[in-house]
């Protein structure tokens, strides 16, 4: 029998959620590479206000398995606030940001399909992390649309804060 894998859902607006209510269990041991039998970091994290359909979840989990990231992958379903020209910014959930991203404003390098974009990671309200400058160009250059899914993989051992972005087009599910 496959061991349960915990997929963390987290708030993106600074609200606090108990660890029990912020975790979903799925029975797919192939995602869990932890041989110790104890809890480990979830393989991916989805903001609590986002919900993956069954077909989206299946595709995301296959992609996560293929990526084999050391840190959990942050999953974002593109909403109007991320892609509409007048708003274009991307928020990282508070819990993901606190656990995996530095707590200071700086440049974040995004890599996608062999190209790079420098974006500005900014902090609002003391703890909310957003990508701004450079994010609109990333959106445009990659043809991101409402409903597309981006998987943000934190790259270790880079001289600059870097994330590889894997895009799943809405037509794939």
Regions found by a protein language model. Name each.
Residues 1-130, 136-173:
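Intrinsically disordered, low-complexity regulatory/interaction regions
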């Amino acid at each position: 029998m496959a061991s349960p894998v915990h997929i963390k859902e987290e708030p993106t607006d600074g609200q606090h959620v108990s660890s029990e209510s912020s975790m979903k269990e799925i029975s797919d041991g192939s995602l869990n590479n932890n041989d110790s039998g104890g809890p480990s970091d979830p393989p991916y994290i989805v903001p609590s206000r986002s919900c993956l359909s069954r077909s989206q979840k299946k595709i995301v989990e296959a992609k996560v398995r293929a990526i084999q990231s050391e840190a959990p992958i942050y999953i974002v379903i593109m909403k109007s606030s991320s892609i509409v020209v007048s708003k274009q910014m991307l928020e990282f959930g508070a819990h993901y940001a606190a656990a995996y991203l530095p707590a200071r404003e700086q440049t974040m390098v995004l890599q996608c399909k062999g190209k790079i974009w420098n974006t500005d990671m900014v902090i609002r309200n003391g703890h909310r992390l957003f990508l701004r400058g450079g994010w609109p160009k990333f959106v445009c250059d990659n043809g991101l649309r409402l409903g597309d899914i981006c998987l943000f993989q934190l790259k270790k051992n880079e001289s600059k804060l870097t994330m590889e972005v894997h895009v799943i087009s809405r037509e794939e599910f």
